[in-house]
């Protein structure tokens, strides 16, 4: 158990930071952050919790306990075989990232349909999968000092290899960005865990996941060796066991671009509305396009 967990002051400061973060997001109106209760995390005798659903790869409230099998070539949970793709190296990333991109299928000459940068591996990926996003905020000053030392070593070894000189230039560029704009150095990792109980279907899922990552401009990396460790680190509360070698250094601004903000549509709570359909899967929805948008501050006028 980390010593910080036993420190009441450290726990209190952590909870205060979480509460402040929650208020900031909830004040934006468009994004709502809700803290899970203990029962929602670990479950009750009548209803499965988040951890139990994760271990069984199921969204059902009544889940089935499944055996977890690990081997050198694959990982199985019950009958399901895991297929893991990772973004853990800067060489696998595009030259630039952004918070949102234009989705051509639903855009016109006069209007844009904007989706998050990572939308292709979110709801747009039509298979059973989990998209995990990790941001590790360590001591930024210590990280930058470590890079300064590495840059000096690379400079000393530059006469032996041109690669060392190029690495020093990349490190200097990273340090210049950090010091010029006051950016916070962090570690980031993203992975897509897909699964199927059919090996033939799993091959299709593997290709679809690789294509989705390619749409983001990323190089798909199929990971079999670290799948068990990454699955364990994805347990709610298990991020402390994340394998550090699977992360890459970046800044907060670039790291959050790999978040996916889309979610499935939900019925409006209003007693009246119109029937529409989810564009992704055709699910019928009850939608209030009149009063509810005004209550939420999305629009200030309406025509009835």
Go through the PLM ranges and name each one.
Residues 1-263:
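Extended, folded cores of ATP/NTP-driven motor/assembly subunits in large transport
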């Amino acid at each position: 158990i980390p010593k910080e967990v036993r420190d009441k002051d450290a726990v209190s400061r952590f909870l205060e930071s979480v509460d402040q973060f929650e208020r900031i997001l909830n004040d934006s109106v468009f994004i709502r952050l809700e803290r899970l209760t203990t029962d929602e995390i670990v479950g009750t005798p009548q209803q499965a919790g988040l951890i139990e659903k994760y271990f069984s790869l199921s969204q059902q409230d009544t889940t089935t306990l499944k055996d977890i099998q690990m081997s050198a070539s694959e990982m199985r949970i019950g009958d399901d075989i895991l297929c893991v793709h990772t973004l853990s190296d800067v060489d696998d990333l595009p030259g630039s990232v952004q918070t949102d991109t234009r989705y051509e299928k639903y855009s016109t000459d006069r209007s844009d349909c904007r989706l998050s940068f990572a939308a292709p591996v979110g709801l747009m990926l039509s298979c059973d999968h989990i998209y995990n996003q990790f941001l590790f905020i360590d001591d930024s000053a210590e990280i930058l000092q470590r890079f300064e030392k590495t840059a000096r070593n690379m400079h000393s070894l530059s006469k032996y290899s041109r690669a060392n000189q190029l690495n020093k230039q990349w490190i200097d560029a990273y340090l210049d960005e950090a010091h010029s704009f006051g950016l916070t150095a962090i570690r980031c990792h993203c992975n897509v865990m897909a699964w199927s109980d059919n090996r033939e279907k799993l091959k299709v899922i593997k290709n679809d996941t690789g294509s989705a990552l390619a749409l983001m401009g990323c190089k798909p990396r199929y990971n079999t060796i670290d799948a068990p460790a990454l699955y364990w680190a994805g347990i709610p509360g298990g991020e402390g066991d994340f394998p550090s070698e699977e992360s890459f250094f970046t800044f907060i601004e670039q790291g959050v671009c790999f978040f996916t903000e889309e979610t499935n549509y939900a019925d409006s709570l209003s007693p009246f509305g119109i029937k529409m359909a989810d564009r992704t899967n055709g699910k019928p929805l009850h939608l209030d396009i009149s009063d509810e948008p005004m209550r939420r501050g999305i629009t200030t006028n309406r025509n009835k």
